[in-house]
Each structure stands twice: as structure tokens, then as C-alpha cells.
Amino acid sequence: MNEYGCLEVLMPMVQPKSLWDETKRSEQMGPELLGFLDRNEREFYLGPTHEEVITDICRQELQSHKDLPKTFYQIQTKFRDEIRPRFGVMRGREFLMKDAYSFYLEEDGMIKSYQAMKECYQKIFDEIGFDYKIVKADSGAIGGNMSEEFHVLADSGEDTLVFNDKDFSSNIELLDDSLKTEIEKKIENNDLSDIDSEHGKLSIKKGIEVGHIFELGNKYSKAMGLGVQHDNSQKTLEMGCYGIGVSRIVAAAIEQNHDSEGIVFPKNISAFDCSLISINEKKSEIVKKKAKEIYSYLINNNVDVFYDDRDAS
């Protein structure tokens, strides 16, 4: 994120309901918002996302077109009152997220920022080593002009993805009647079978959503009065937002990287490359000496080692 000119911040976890009332998302998200009252009976939410908060900050701090463009990001715990929390960190009420928000004077700038963040996310997921797809998606309660999701392909995924090997990919939730096709041949009783259509051969796979990027346009800036002085008038800003589910990345990595013995994390996100266990080194100087020789050799060859030298059986 830093390489793409983004500025790291840390925004408040506790958000006043009044900010959400400005965008009417307090009504849209409803029971998903985890709220409470303070001692003065004022309503607050534990932040599920931070569009309102960052817009409020920027309407106080950004005064001129000279302050633009800006993209802020944070890595922070989020809260959503999920109706059915399940699958450990895959879908919980509390999760870690990397979220970013961009602010531009013109729509062209916002679109370029969207493409830059898309490229940035591709680099991140490529470096991790995921087998993933980028698909068109419903923007949901966050809203905006358009959005795309990043899905790690896994049979345990909750989303169904439809794509070909060229230029078409979508979350199945977004498909309309134009993509329906008559099927004359018999197929196996499995909703994940490949099908032929006017778009070519379509593959249908399950995916775990690990990232989502949005062209917000002026949805939040207009509702909350975020603008700057430009050419002797007040110009409403164009926004984008971009999220990565940090907690979910761990679950997705496990789904794609395991064997009969357990988890095999990709090297770039593993805590260490190997474990070195010294057995009974307290009773044997030879074992102790050899273990330390092996440890030194591995460290000197840039191998990240977990050296377990506990006095335990």
C-alpha cells in the first residue's frame, strides 16, 4: 500500500450513530450494526467499516484541491453482528481488515485509483500464492458505481463464481437473464458443472471472498457535504474504497494449502520456514551442540527457523 502512495492511519473503532444517519446506512445495514448506548444515552456503533468516519475526517481537513489526491488505509478490527457466524475466522462477528479510501477531484482520478488498487491487490494475492479470480460483484450496502471481488477458489467457499477463460467473470448473484442459456443435453446432478453458452464455455466454481474494491463516486461525499474549493466553487469529491479481509486470508490459505498431515502455509505468510526440535538436549551435550550447529547453519543460509529447545518431554 505504501508503494502506491497510500498513507497509513488508525481510525476510531467506536463510531457515533449520527454519522451513519447522514448516509442513511444505519437503516440499510440495520441489525448487522453492533451498537450500544453510552452513559448519556447516545448511540454508537462498533465500526463494521469506515466510509462515514473517513469522510467526516476529510470534510474537516481537506480544504483545497491542492490537498488532493489522497488515499488513506488502516489495518483494524471490525465488528458485524452476523446472523450466522461460522467456519471460525471465515465469517465471524469480529475480524481483522485492511481498508483503504481514496479522494479525488475528478471521476477520472477516482477510476485511475481504482485500477491502481486493483493492481496492488493482485500483487498481494500473487505474492501469497493464491489461485484466485477477480469477478464483478454487487456493491451491496456500501454502494457506488461498480465493484469487483477477489475470490480464492475453494470448494468450501460460500460464493458461486461464473467465468470463462477470456474476458468474463462474475459472482453468480450479479447475473441477469441475458446470461441464461437453454441446456438440452443431460448433465450430472451438480450445480458446479461447466456449461456452454453464448459467452463460450463457462466454469462455475466456489470461492472465498478475500478482497473487494468499489468505485463509490460521490455517494458519501455528497451525502456528508465533502468538497473543496476549486475554480471559485465548491467541488464534491469522488471516492473509492478498497478492502482486504486479513483474517479470512488465513482461512483461505489453509483451504488451498494443506495435506493429510495438516496446514502447509505458503512461504510468504508462514510464521517460519521450518521447526528444529532438540530432544533431551539437557541430558546430552552432543544433541545440544548438534542442534545449535544446525540452527546456526540454517540462520546463516537465510532460513527462518523455529528452534524449540524447551526442557519438556
Question: Where are the regions that the model predicts?
Answer:
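NTP/phosphate- and nucleic-acid-binding module
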Residues: 2-313
